[in-house]
From Swiss-Prot:
Name of the featured protein: Ketol-acid reductoisomerase (NADP(+))
Domain KARI N-terminal Rossmann: 2-182
InterPro entries documented for this protein: 6-PGluconate_DH-like_C_sf, KARI, KARI_C, KARI_N, KARI_prok, NAD(P)-bd_dom_sf
Catalytic activity: (2R)-2,3-dihydroxy-3-methylbutanoate + NADP(+) = (2S)-2-acetolactate + NADPH + H(+); (2R,3R)-2,3-dihydroxy-3-methylpentanoate + NADP(+) = (S)-2-ethyl-2-hydroxy-3-oxobutanoate + NADPH + H(+)
Annotated substrate binding sites: 252
Cofactor binding description: Binds 2 magnesium ions per subunit.
Species of the source: Pyrobaculum aerophilum (strain ATCC 51768 / DSM 7523 / JCM 9630 / CIP 104966 / NBRC 100827 / IM2)
Length: 328
């Protein structure tokens, strides 16, 4: 069983009197920086000079420094810039300025797990990974709640790395909801696998293929859109609130029977086999290697696929339907 920590098992004491440098002030960086400051901790921001984020962080009362200087001033460093920017920034601005014994925190294990970032042995390396976008991290904190998070220790130089991870999780409000202890490998691999076979890749293709089937059978695209995309949110909300069995108890008997008998014929063992193949590509590092090479070439394949997604017929129909639902 997973080890779950709440507010009672976490303390801010390990961070008291320490300087926390948040590297990056995007959606996640801003949310975590504000929450940590509101929890009574000393927070500075590390950014490239002159950008909009610099102006925003300054206007919100933070002391802002160039990344290297922020790292030199810090006892605890949160690396909250986009994954694919991290290796270059790490090599050029973070690693040369690290002090012995500092704590470095990541929100995702990708670069460390796959060896794109190789931390020195004389620091703590931890992860606090909120399981929600930055907007929710901030809003839930302000509401007196929190979003769940994963915590992990990659390197425990001080002997207190887990205490630092739990303190950061408490500082951003995550222990109010509960944090699960994991590893860099488990967080990274399950995150990528979940995105690919269910959350982004799986759902997207299931919806698109369902739309195509209905339209090819002669049904109106607008009706098809409502049936396979718009109503998907209603079902997902039920699953989120009640679980799969609870969702089944919230739909009609006709929907129950049709779903339970036809669903396994469509998402069959062959689909499960392909899911496992995709999962093994992640676990082996094959996907990471492919993606890093793609990114370093300027992401031509990604741009092509994004254009195909943008021009899919469901997007034109969806644009009109969303105007009806939400206004122009």
């Amino acid at each position: 069983m997973a080890k779950i920590y709440t507010d009672r098992e976490a303390s801010l004491e390990p961070l008291k009197g320490k300087t926390i440098a948040v590297i990056g002030y995007g959606i996640q960086g801003r949310a975590q920086a504000l929450n940590l400051r509101d929890s009574g901790l000393e927070v500075i921001i590390g950014l490239r000079r002159g950008g909009k984020s610099w102006e925003l962080a300054t206007s919100e009362g933070f002391r802002v420094y160039e990344i290297g200087e922020a790292v030199r001033k810090a006892d605890v460093i949160l690396v909250l810039i986009p994954d694919m920017e991290q290796p270059k920034v790490w090599q050029e601005q973070i690693a040369p300025n690290l002090k012995e014994g500092v704590v470095v925190d990541f929100a995702h294990g990708f670069n460390v797990h796959f060896g794109l970032i190789k931390p020195p042995k004389n620091i703590d390396v931890i992860m606090v990974a909120p399981k929600a976008p930055g907007k929710a991290v901030r809003e839930e904190y302000l509401a007196g709640r929190g979003v769940p998070a994963l915590v992990a220790v990659y390197q425990d130089y001080s002997g207190s790395a887990l205490k630092y991870a739990l303190a950061l999780a408490k500082g951003i409000g995550a222990t109010r909801a509960g944090v699960i202890e994991t590893t860099f490998a488990e967080e990274t691999e399950t995150d990528l696998i979940g995105e690919q076979i269910v959350l982004v890749g799986g759902l997207m293709e299931l919806i698109k293929k369902g739309f195509e089937v209905l339209v090819e059978m002669g049904y109106q695209p607008e009706v098809a859109y409502f049936e396979v995309l718009n109503e998907a949110k209603l079902i997902m909300d039920l699953i989120w609130q009640r679980g799969i069995y609870g969702m089944l108890n919230g739909v009609s008997d006709t929907a129950k029977y049709g779903g339970l008998t036809v669903g396994p014929r469509v998402i069959d063992e062959n689909v499960k086999r392909k899911m496992k193949e995709a999962a093994m590509r992640v676990k082996s590092g094959e996907f990471a290697k492919e993606w890093v090479e793609e990114y370093n070439r300027g992401a031509p394949t990604l741009r092509k696929l994004m254009e195909e997604a943008r021009t899919h017929p469901i997007e034109k129909v969806g644009e009109e339907m969303r105007k009806l639902l939400f206004g122009p």
